[in-house]
Amino acid sequence: MSVVFVAASKLPTPFGEFTMHGFLDEESGKEHVALSMGDIADGAPVLGRLHSECLTGDALFSLRCDCGFQLEGALAAIAEEGRGVLLYLRQEGRGIGLLNKIRAYELQDGGADTVEANLQLGFGADQRDYAMCQPMLAHLGVSSLRLMTNNPRKVKALESYAITVAERVPLQRGLNKHNRRYLATKAGKLGHMLGSLHQGEAETT
């Protein structure tokens, strides 16, 4: 994978000022971003998150998922600590793209769960790839993370690229009546660690 650094700038946010680092995957043409705060290249484990793009949750305030809540929670946690990094990865809809995500939502409106909808469209349950994280983190001087995630697949992916996950930090935000079924599916079918509220819970309509 050929991921190259392009530019960096300051990014003031309601949580504090971050540095925004832009990267280009020359093979896919996708543009990824890292937001950093503080000295993250000192060798100590860094509070961090891998956040896949979710236009509906991150920008359009959708309650169908917990993505926007997790994004805000991660940035707030980094700002509170004064040190950390968030990789914003252009992998909309667990890797199937925005329009296919809307198609999947249409199937979910008809009764399918989030995994069934992907499979009915001919996709895997989760098509995301985290290979781009290794060169992005290497550029930033980060080799060890305290990873904010509920997804064990992210932990395994980073470790496969020789990035140490010193700690998994749970990030549970935004449960509501619109996403309860979705989160139950992530726990029951995708193995997400969401606590007793969802773990092993079967979906009900």
Swiss-Prot record:
Highest taxon, organism lineage: Bacteria
Pfam families according to UniProt: GTP_cyclohydro2
Keyword Translocase (UniProt): no
Keywords recorded for this protein, A-Z: GTP-binding, Hydrolase, Metal-binding, Nucleotide-binding, Riboflavin biosynthesis, Zinc
Binding site for GTP: 49-53, 70, 92-94, 114, 149, 154
Residues the record lists as binding Zn(2+): 54, 65, 67
S-adenosyl-L-methionine found in the keyword field: no
Gene3D superfamilies for this protein: GTP cyclohydrolase II
Gene Ontology molecular functions: GTP binding; GTP cyclohydrolase II activity; zinc ion binding
Cofactor note: Binds 1 zinc ion per subunit.
Required cofactor(s): Zn(2+)
Active-site residues (renumbered): 126, 128
A biological process from GO: riboflavin biosynthetic process
Catalysed reactions, semicolon-separated: GTP + 4 H2O = 2,5-diamino-6-hydroxy-4-(5-phosphoribosylamino)-pyrimidine + formate + 2 phosphate + 3 H(+)
NCBIfam families (UniProt xref): PRK00393.1, ribA
Function as written in the Swiss-Prot or TrEMBL entry: Catalyzes the conversion of GTP to 2,5-diamino-6-ribosylamino-4(3H)-pyrimidinone 5'-phosphate (DARP), formate and pyrophosphate.
Designated name of the protein: GTP cyclohydrolase-2
Species, as recorded: Pseudomonas aeruginosa (strain UCBPP-PA14)
